[in-house]
Regions:
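Peripheral, non-AAA+ core regions of ATP-driven protein-machinery
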Residues: 2-12, 16-77, 84-92, 97-104, ...
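Conserved RecA-like ASCE P-loop NTPase motor core of nucleic-acid helicases/translocases
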Residues: 117-121
Length: 448
């Protein structure tokens, strides 16, 4: 006979305990336990079960993952080349960032190719979804809508009429009737995700699930939600700005270094095929503290503008603020400048920003940050046709970075004439005739 009992769950890792604890033994996080009531049924007898026999790894046949296009090249890039049959993809992001919009556009393209799509919404009515869809464009009859909150209703329909792709918007609004807890609770999210994963693998259906995020920027619910799915995508960007960055945090079928760039318009999200041109639009010329760097996001080189402002502080402790860059990394470079270059920055405020709302983690941006800080400190504008990249060590040395040839080619394509790079990279380019020909349009190659 089924009965209810109280269990405490960790919101970060899903660790279960019979009592509340201040620190989770599983992930060592503090104050993450929440109380839930769960229904426990009688354990089934295992007498009639069939014995499970393991298979030798040499007898297992492998097959390449079958992929099909989403109709959005930027989304295909982040997914690793398209959608894999039987995959479970989690899409997270801030409210209003465009999660539902990009999935609706994907569904529109797939239905136009003749694929049957099931869009399940637990947050909006049919008319509300139709209003948003009309802004995007015309949909085909193979685009099916289902507004329910019970997972059993979804499973029942899928057994009758198997779709090619299922979209769940969102995972926090879908419940399983067998579990007596509120929607979005740890136990509900774990059970719903586990059953969706089983459905995807057994029926070879690609399933996309939308996840709400917390104020820390992580998907709401247990941390093991991200471990259960095949791919985790995050939408980044300012809701008040026009550009959105789609980044893969986890991908079992592709690289996690690729990004997709979109622009939010009235008609939906538009793909940005040349991010460098967009990110450098409106760049101020002959202004101190501004420099262009070439970052590598996966296999794609992107030119970005780094802006720095160094001014005399009016506080006892100088302020250091960064936007789009690692705060500790900028502080490290400020210390290197003061120790190795003799620049007295301990009495100055420093503000460093990436124009365009991008987040930059590439170590090759170190040299660009240094150039921007020195330019602002001395109030000397840099050459507007110059691109900089290179990693800076604690001893003040400039270290080589990967894919120097790709970075230079991107700079040439965008019309830049001067490239300052690590000496090791420059020597490698000079030894190759092919690389030399690619650099013929650069007027000056300076290695410092």
């Amino acid at each position: 006979m089924a009965k209810e009992k109280q269990i405490f769950f960790c919101r970060e890792c899903g660790f279960e305990s019979a009592k509340w604890m201040g620190q989770c033994p599983g992930c060592r996080s503090w104050n993450t336990f929440c109380e839930e009531k769960v229904t426990v049924g009688a354990r089934k007898q295992s007498g009639g079960r069939t014995a499970v026999v393991p298979t030798s790894i040499l007898e297992v046949k492998t097959a390449d993952e079958t992929r099909f296009s989403t109709g959005l090249e930027e989304l295909n890039r982040v997914l690793g080349g398209g959608i894999v049959n039987g995959s479970l993809v989690l899409v997270g992001g801030d409210p209003g960032i465009g999660k539902s919009t990009i999935l609706l556009q994907m569904c529109r393209n797939l239905s136009a190719d003749g694929h049957k799509i099931l869009y399940v919404s637990g947050e909006e009515s049919l008319s509300q979804i139709k209003m948003r869809a009309e802004r995007i464009g015309t949909f085909q009859k193979d685009m099916l809508l289902l507004c329910v909150n019970n997972l059993e209703d979804v499973e029942e329909y899928v057994k009758k009429d198997k779709p090619k792709v299922i979209v769940i918007d969102s995972i926090q609004t879908i419940v399983v009737e067998d579990i007596a807890s509120a929607p979005g609770s740890v136990s509900q999210v774990k059970e719903v995700t586990a059953r969706l994963m089983q459905m995807a693998k057994q029926m070879d259906i690609a399933i996309f699930i939308v996840g709400h995020v917390t104020k820390e920027g992580t998907v709401a619910g247990p941390r093991n939600l991200e471990h259960m799915v095949d791919t985790v995508l995050y939408f980044e960007g300012d809701r008040n700005a026009g550009f959105r960055i789609l980044r893969a945090v986890k991908n079992r079928f592709g690289s996690t270094n690729e990004i997709g760039v979109f622009e939010m318009l009235e008609t939906g999200l538009s793909e940005v095929n040349n991010p460098s041109k967009v990110m450098l639009a409106g760049r101020p010329l002959q202004t101190s503290g501004s420099v262009v760097v070439c970052s590598l996001e996966g296999t794609r080189p992107i030119l970005l503008e780094i802006q720095a402002l160094v001014c005399q502080t009016s506080f006892n402790l100088p302020r250091r603020t960064t936007v789009g860059l690692d705060y500790n990394r900028v502080n490290l470079l400020l210390a290197v400048l003061e120790k190795r270059a003799g620049m007295v920055l301990s009495g100055s405020d420093a503000y460093v920003n990436i124009a365009g709302g991008m987040r930059l983690d590439d170590p090759a941006a170190d040299l660009g940050i240094v150039f921007a800080l020195v330019s602002s400190f001395r109030n000397r504008p840099l050459d507007e046709s110059m691109v900089v990249f290179g990693e800076v060590g604690l001893s003040g040395e400039v270290r080589g970075v990967s894919a120097a040839e790709q970075r230079v080619r991107e700079a040439v394509k965008m019309g830049f004439r001067t490239c300052i790079m690590p000496k090791t990279n420059a020597e490698h380019l000079e030894r190759s005739e092919e690389h030399t020909s690619e650099l013929q349009s650069l007027e000056d190659l300076v290695c410092r």
